[in-house]
Swiss-Prot record:
This is Ankyrin repeat domain-containing protein 29. The keyword Oxidoreductase does not apply. It comes from Danio rerio (Zebrafish). It comes from the Eukaryota. ANK repeats lie at residues 8-38, 42-71, 75-104, 108-137, 141-170, 174-203, 207-236, 239-268. The gene is ankrd29. The keyword Repeat applies.
Amino acid sequence: MSFKKETPLANAVFWAARKGNLALLQLLLNSGRVDVDCKDAYGTTALMVASYSGHYECVRELIMQGADINLQRETGSTALFFASQQGHNEIVKLLFEFGASTEFQTKDGGTALCAACQFGHSRVVDTLLKNGANVHDQLNDGATALFLASQEGHVNLIRQLLSSGAKVNQPREDGTAPLWMAAQMGHSEVVKVLLLRGADRDADRKDGSTALFKAAHKGHCSVMEELLKFSPSLGILKNGSTALHAAVMGGSLKAVDLLLKANADPALPNTNNELPRDLTKSERILRVLRLPLMNGES
């Protein structure tokens, strides 16, 4: 968290809030020479700094001195946002006790819930949801709290959100669903949980790629194994290729082998009339691709 300090006294207030120096903070605020809501050029307040830094007693002192809990920084962030982002659950509870709102958004649409989910703070998420946070909160690009948790691999938090009513297939504006993002990032446990909770195994992005296609291209074999348990499409996708083409292009021999064992067809061309074998010079992969053809399986 960066901030610009304006005056020597404001500078001292920010320093005390950041370091958790309660005695100095009280001295400055009681002097009557500095506003409890003094701001820097970004709109940062001492309450935001103390909340971000996790100094409970300083946060309480600032509130008792009349700090406005719901002031927003230039970016839209509030004290609650910063406390949630950093996982300071007791401070989150304290802010709620004195009227913090869950509805404020940053310029990119982020809420305190989104921040807590992105950074995996399950206790904070529980507190936020109990105090009115909307489990369907999403960024301006459509990424939901569940999407952010899936992207970062926070399995227990994902279970928590799904149990609170989060939509497992809610995509981002570009069509990317939580399952697709988890597959891209290689989070096999997340993929497993999402599939068991009803995620569409063949949901595709606007570019036509599916979770299996992306995992195959990245060589995330543990993810592929979870997806293959749910019999995803091995045929031509909307992007004109198959998962086998993706695996070959990605260069993972194990990924290619997994797909062949799942009965992917090495003789199926993409819409450019290219066979998977046309997309690699790897002798090891070419050898594996030839085996089904030699055995008459295609």
